Amino acid sequence: MNRRSKWLWIEPITGSRKRSNFFWACILFLGSLGFFLVGISSYFGENLIPLLSSQQILFVPQGIVMCFYGIAGLFISSYLWCTILFNVGSGYNKFDKKKGIVCLFRWGFPGINRRIFSRFLMKDIQMIKTEIQEGISPRRVLYMEIKGRQDIPLTRTGDNVNLREIEQKAAESARFLRVSIEGF
């Protein structure tokens, strides 16, 4: 939901709370938990999970390896769940024509740098850039070029945005900021 008026444009940014992240976090958690429980079952010699038979699996070396992969998967799954819980990457882009200021805000992991906030003047914005790479894994990203700074992405690099949407967003941003568009 974009909030836009003649002088102010606030664009919310979706963070890590996406359906795909929930899906992969669940799949990874269940799979790694299964690996870990089968490895532990092979150690005790009993089936802890009725559906997964561990009678033919020796603890050394298969059970140890399954426990290791299960623990590694649980750590990766907990990382994914933490990014979802803290909504890492979410925030907003705020363009204020009256004050001539652009503010970019994102949430990070807890700690000193939990709030990531960038502020700069609109007159320092040189252009809006679009990076479009087609192929097996297409990449379509919208950047804002600012004097004396590196290009700042306005869209997430992992989002699968179609070509029409990225072009419309680039045109809308350039029109509001009154800058040119460059594609590469």
From Swiss-Prot:
Pfam families: Ycf4. One of its GO terms (cellular component) is photosystem I. Keywords: Chloroplast, Membrane, Photosynthesis, Plastid, Thylakoid, Transmembrane, Transmembrane helix. It is a multi-pass membrane protein. Its main location: plastid. InterPro entries: PSI_Ycf4_assembly. The chain crosses the membrane at residues 21-43, 58-78. The keyword Membrane applies. It comes from the Eukaryota. One of its GO terms (biological process) is photosynthesis. It is found in: Plastid, Chloroplast thylakoid membrane. NCBIfam families: PRK02542.1. Belongs to the Ycf4 family. PANTHER family: PHOTOSYSTEM I ASSEMBLY PROTEIN YCF4 (PTHR33288:SF4), PTHR33288. Seems to be required for the assembly of the photosystem I complex. This is Photosystem I assembly protein Ycf4. It comes from Pinus koraiensis. The lineage of its organism: Eukaryota, Viridiplantae, Streptophyta, Embryophyta, Tracheophyta. The gene is ycf4.
